[in-house]
């Protein structure tokens, strides 16, 4: 299954979710590829300790802009490979908008189709905005998981990204489906409780039962350039992401 993990805005736990879902699947013995198309490259920086030494030719930039095969790197997590991102991806909207005759929305899909048989699951870490990179990710995917953190503006952004999903389904990828809404950074505050209540009232069965708690172990893991399972497999976040993978992939 190819799953895009997306959010309309930053700071929702999207990248943490991408890394954690990929790592949780790998821990279950599955062969996993994480494709980072977020120009901030945070997934890449966590999973590849030597990321800063990579040139753009060793990243997904060469596929999206150069129309060349994916450059796949092994990580220190057994069973988990990554296609890293690059800061220059932040300029892709201008370049891809000028290439419409080339069907720019399919650039990632074309190359993913060539390697998909080598993996049980492919996770795409999308940028925190609606762009040509998001369109490429959704066009290549079977499912989209939308990450939502507590807050009024976070809930408001769901409408936009849901509309994008429907537009991609209508125009580029008729098989695309919503995997569900994942509530992250949950805590005991009123804002968090109200946000979750509104999310469940509005989207009912489309909201995952699993809730991801706010957990300092996640930031500590990132500083150590480790996924949450390699850093603290007994943490609340690790337990939650393990439950999410079981729920989502029925493992």
Annotate each language-model stretch with its function.
Residues 1-251:
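P-loop NTP-binding core
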């Amino acid at each position: 299954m190819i799953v895009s993990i997306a959010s309309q805005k930053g700071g929702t736990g999207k990248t943490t979710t991408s890394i954690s879902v990929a790592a949780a699947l790998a821990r279950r013995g599955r062969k996993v590829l994480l494709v980072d198309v977020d120009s901030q490259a945070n997934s890449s920086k966590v999973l590849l300790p030597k990321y800063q030494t990579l040139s753009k030719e060793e990243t997904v930039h060469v596929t999206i802009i150069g129309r060349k095969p994916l450059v796949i790197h092994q990580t220190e997590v057994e069973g988990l490979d990554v296609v890293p991102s690059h800061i220059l991806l932040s300029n892709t909207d201008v370049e891809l908008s000028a290439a419409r005759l080339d069907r720019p929305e399919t650039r990632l899909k074309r190359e993913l189709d060539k390697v998909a048989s080598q993996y049980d699951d492919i996770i795409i870490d999308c940028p925190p905005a609606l762009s040509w990179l998001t369109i490429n990710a959704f066009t290549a995917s079977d499912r989209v998981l939308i990450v939502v953190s507590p807050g009024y503006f976070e809930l408001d952004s769901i409408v936009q990204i849901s509309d994008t999903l429907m537009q991609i389904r209508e125009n580029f990828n008729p098989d695309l489906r919503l995997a569900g809404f994942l509530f992250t950074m949950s805590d005991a505050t009123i804002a968090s409780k109200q946000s979750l209540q509104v999310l469940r009232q509005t989207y009912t069965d489309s909201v995952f039962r699993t809730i991801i708690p706010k957990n300092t172990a996640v930031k500590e893991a990132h500083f150590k350039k480790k996924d949450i399972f390699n850093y603290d497999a007994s943490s609340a976040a690790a337990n939650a992401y393990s439950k999410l993978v079981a729920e989502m992939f029925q493992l």
